[in-house]
Amino acid sequence: YLLYTGVMLTSLCENNPCHIDVYILHSELTDKDIQRLKDCLDKYDVTIYLLYIEKDKFAGRMYTDKMWSIEAYYRLMLLDVLPPNVKRMFYFDVDIIVNKSLEAFYNMNFDGNDLIACEDDCGNCVPEHYGPMHRKIFGSEELHNHRYFNSGVLLMNIEQMRHKYNYDYYMGIARDVWNYKMEAPDQDILNYVHHKSCLLY
């Protein structure tokens, strides 16, 4: 995914000519990989921070397949590894393209919410395509009106979230609520935890 990461970050920088702090969650990047990323972004006002994640924190418990790698769960450790000066931030999957300025989006008022995200209204995450665990959890009385969001682009209220959530909390939800049988792994966990505190963009 290194190539995709470089393309995504280049599109971000091209359309947002300001200083950007980039935090990259990883467990296997080599010095050569890191240098390639830095070379790719050399002409932009970017500072790259590498946040190492221990793969063993997730391996052996969380569902993976050809589509869902273990790295998909790394965002569940963000609140544990980010420096204390980070108040809000975007989370981006690497398979996106930024095609315009994000200034207005970045400065949106959270109105007390943990997240700002976009509704996921296609694929397997809509009621008519729910699998058994989705039907059980998102079809429950508490969540049946929940508008499921896509976790590939998130504006995160880090200042608020770090006082309530951490890796252990999210993993507890994976175990106690989902029995590790998520259908859209980390995205299901985030939708369950933040279903009352996500503003749809």
Where are these regions (language model features)?
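Glycosyltransferase catalytic domains, chiefly GT-A lineage
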Residues: Y1-L200
